[in-house]
Structures are given as structure tokens and as C-alpha cells.
Amino acid sequence: MPSQIPEGWGEAPRPRRPEPARICGVNAVRALFLRRPEAVIRLHYLAERRPVAGPLCRYLARHHKAYREVLDDELTRIAGTEHHGGIVALAEPRRALPMPNPPPPILFAGSVLPVLDGIGNPHNLGAIARGAAFFGAKAMILSDDPRQADLSDAAYRTSEGGLEHMAVFRAEHLPSLLRRLSGQFLVTAAVAAGGQPPHALPRGKPIALVLGNEESGPSPEVLACCEARITLAGSGLVESLNVAAATAVLMHALMGPKA
């Protein structure tokens, strides 16, 4: 008697569909609908967010996508956090793109290009993106350091929409990339001590601003590829600023007129 082999037995399992990104908060959700509306899967919101959600729901209705008003405990469950801001969009996930060769033109669209070398906290990544977008950065590079955070729900939430306005790339080997960029950028490391003030940098070409790991700063190999180092002068009462706060101050200084 022939054996009955279940259909599909022995076949490789189908790859699981990636979990959707959970984009939380009014500013982040608005930026998502502005920049990547086709990526939205569905929308959930509290009654108090009806004025914000109304136009977004009309867009979703036209494109036959789901939306629903929910209570706070359900929105917290959907968001995975109580810090949901009253509105959550589920969207197709986005990850940092591999850096192409040659580098894409968008890297040169702003006067300062943030380069993150081992920034491990996704909240810091998001806050850096928020400040960078505020000051007009168009792109950001993430290092190949295994500590480096990628785009995530937490990063999107803290970026307040900033990540949606930036192209994000991941370097295959950051020191090699910085050496390639050095002819077109002034590659500059932000360091806690020993650097020159930001206003002292020459302004003949855009600046690739290297921001190091929260605890240890840029790696020695990356520092060796930097043509300049800059440091913010403080009171001396604390060692340094949080990396996201320091980035915002540095970008403001570097984008202003040279002193």
C-alpha cells in the first residue's frame, strides 16, 4: 500500500512576512502619510485624535485600507508602548539601505551629513534624526558596527517624523567609506575633548559629521579616517552632552556662518 505523504512535506518553510513597523505619535504618523503613504497598512487612533485622523482615514478609505478608533488600552497593546501619542499607523517596515557605489547624490544635498558609528540606543538614533532633519540634513549613514541601532519603532517615535524626511544608508565598512568620501566631504569626528571648536572648521565643502558610540565614542579605526575633530566647550561641571543633544548643537554651529 503506497504511503500517504502530506502535501508540502519536505519543502523548505516559506519565509515569514516581516512584522509591520508601528509608527506612533501625531508628527511621525503625519510624516509617514506625507512621505510614504503607500506603505501604510492600517491606522488606529483615540477619539481625541479624530481631527488628526480624519483626513488620513479618508485617504485610507479611498485606497481600501483599514482604520479604526480604539480605546487607550487597546492602542497601548497595538503600539507596544504607552507612549503612543494617541495615534498609531502600522506600515511596511523600512530598513537602512546598503550604501551604493558610487555614493548617491542625496548624500551631497545637505551641508552636514550625520554618520553614526555604533550609536546603540534607538531613542538616540531617532533624536539625532529629529535634530538633523530640523537643520536640513537629507541623509544619514549608519555604521557596520554590530552595536549600531537600525530603524525601529522606538527610533521612529523619537524622531517625530524626522526619519521620514531622510535617506538612511548602512555602510558595509565605515572606514573604507569615509576614505572614499574624504575628497568630497570634510570628514569630522565629534569628540568629548581635544577637538577644535566647530566655528574653526574650514567651510569649502560639506561636512561628514561622525558621531560615536554613547560610551566609547568613535572607534580608533574610524577616528583615523577623520581629517578633523571638533569638541563643544562646556562649563566642565559634566563631561559631555547626550549624543543627540550634542548633534543638534553641532549642526546648528556648523550650518551657521563661519565666525
Give the predicted meaning of each segment:
Residues 30, 35, 131-134, 151-162, ...:
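Structured adenosyl-cofactor binding patch, chiefly the S-adenosyl-L-methionine
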Residues 187-238, 242:
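Active-site/ligand-binding-proximal alpha/beta "capping" segment
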Residues 48, 72-74, 144-147, 215:
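Short, ordered loop/turn segments at secondary-structure junctions
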Residues 38, 55, 105-196:
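RNA substrate-binding interface of SAM-dependent RNA methyltransferases
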